[in-house]
C-alpha cells in the first residue's frame, strides 16, 4: 500500500521528526506486518505504540480485549505526555468528538443539498481540515458554515450526482475532474470521510475507555471489520441504498494500490 509506504518513508527521512510518537493499528493486511517495520525503524527515535483491534468485537470478550488494548495505548500516551490521563479527560474528549461528528454528519447532508456551492474539492477540504485543527475550533467553524448553508435554497442540480467509496479520495486534481464534468458528490462511504464519523461514542458509560470500545464495536457495514452476516451482502445493500437515498446516479469506487 502506497499510503503506508509513504508514511514510513516520511518517518525515515525526518519529515515527521516533530512527532513524539506514532500509533500503528493492525486493521488491514498491510499494517499488520508493517507495524513491526515502524517499530524497528523508529523505535529509537520516538514512541511506537502498537494497537490491535479485535475483529470479534461484539461479545463481552471482544469488548474487554479492546479495553485492554486502549489501556495499553493510554499508558504509552501518559508516558509521552508526562502526566496521567484521567477518566474526566477522556469523557471530555468524547463529548468534544461527538459534537464534531454531529457537525460533520450535518455538513455532508447539506453539501448534497447545496452541491452548486460545495464542490467536490471544497467538500473534501472541509472534511480533511478536521485532521489538522483543534477540534473545538473546527466544530465551531463548521457549525457556522452549516448555518449559512441551511439558509440557502436547495440546489436544483442539473448535472450528475455520485456516491464515492473507498479508503481515501482527497486528491484535488482528481476531484477537479468531477467538477469539470459537472459531477457532484451526493454522499460518501469513504473511510477517511463519512465512515470515520458515522458512529458516536456513548456519553453515559461510567468507564470512558469502555465507551470507546463500545463505539468501535458499534461500527457496522465496514469492509475492514468482521461481519458475521457477510454472506447476506449487508454492506453491498447498505451502499446501494445510500446511492438511492442520496439521489445519486451511480457509485465511484476508489481502490488503493494493493488494498
Per-region residue spans from a language model:
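Trp/Phe/Arg-rich N-terminal binding region typifying the photolyase-homology
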Residues: 1-88, 189-192, 197-259
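A charged, amphipathic alpha-helical module
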Residues: 67, 71, 75-203
